[in-house]
């Protein structure tokens, strides 16, 4: 950096010096604090701590979910929170219902608007009015009909574009997101393997017919993520070629996943998996898109899942696993 951008580096050093001098006046005896908050990483190859530079140069630091904001304050940037507590705010990520409901699922939008009007398009809280129709058999049937239609549309699209056949009568269990170890697609795959073995060992049990749909891409150099994709396809190959699994269990890794594909998959989903290790997902917005389209969330208490659970009620979301604090305690105990 010094060779390519010498003046930029000089300015960064100047800002760092001024910042450290101001902190030194507040905490004259805490030299370790100065070392921790310096923009310069002092090791064999000096590096610029860009997040620190950003914090000092910003009037506001936003977390993107309540848990994420709390982690920023107590762990990631706790020294800076001590210096600038007024700068740290929470701004939970969000999505636009114009795209992720009205545009991708016009059929569901139509039956919602028929009941409560179209004010929900710009004031999403108006969807709470639907609670009055939760036990209405006619509305329930309309909702089920839309879900079935979107599943048929996805099945037809997959058949036409990838030659893959899936049964719209089965439960669509979906995990679509960037492939990463912390997002735990591997955990989902292990569950598929477990379910497959259980079906083989106990064919008499009344298992619900289920289609597992995976989608996502790995970073070019992320070897482990590519192994996870490989494993998912290998498991799909075994399960889908087993005659005993006919009409009972199917596994599909949807090729060439992108936003356009997501627009087809999300309205068709029955169960949506958001199972990151607690404390690792900043927020996530896929969970919001799925629940807006009537899917049930299976997830950990991480990111925006926590706030979704508070909003919809614990009885309307499937959660499991450790909390962020429990994960942290386990890590500190030498796990």
Region locations from a protein language model:
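A conserved ligand/cofactor-binding region detector
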Residues: 1-335
